[in-house]
């Protein structure tokens, strides 16, 4: 297992939804396979990977039969409402279909926690701030930056207004 993946790890934050660090090699992907991950939603940019790591992960995912979708978001950056909506809806569809979903950013602390809070808020019919609290109970390192929390609340408000 890569040092990064071992250090930052992952955790199940809701039924069927696991968030964490980005896998960097075949051993990291094998660890995800061992916990029955069937789909990955990747929020990492190509530039965040070490040389050759992205290609190794793609090959390992294919070999493991794990499907991946990506939405490259800037590390430490903001999340637009449309980006949150896409990631949340995709993961929600997968979860509804019985998939076990791994949602990751680089360390599993910020971008992935923000999107996971949107998923938990919708699934549990709770406010996003409460969803973040639940996620932190299950994965204490999950802590979106202040501007990412604001992005989540902006998305939530816009979504509610459309109903």
Question: What does each model-identified segment do?
Answer:
Residues 1-102, 107, 115-163:
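Cys-dependent protein tyrosine phosphatase-like superfamily
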């Amino acid at each position: 297992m890569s040092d990064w993946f071992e250090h930052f790890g992952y955790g199940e934050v809701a039924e069927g939804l696991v968030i964490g660090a980005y896998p960097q090699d075949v051993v990291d992907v094998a660890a995800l396979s061992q916990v029955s991950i069937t789909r990955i939603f990747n929020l990492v940019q190509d530039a965040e990977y070490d040389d050759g790591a992205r290609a190794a992960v793609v090959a390992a995912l294919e070999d493991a039969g794990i499907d991946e979708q990506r939405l490259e978001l800037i590390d430490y950056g903001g999340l637009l409402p449309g980006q949150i909506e896409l990631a949340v809806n995709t993961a929600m569809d997968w979860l509804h279909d019985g998939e076990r979903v791994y949602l990751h950013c680089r360390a599993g602390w910020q971008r992935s926690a923000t999107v996971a809070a949107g998923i938990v808020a919708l699934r549990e019919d709770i406010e996003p701030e409460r969803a973040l609290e639940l996620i932190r109970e299950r994965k204490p390192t999950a802590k979106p930056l202040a501007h990412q929390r604001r992005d989540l609340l902006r998305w939530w408000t816009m979504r509610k207004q459309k109903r």
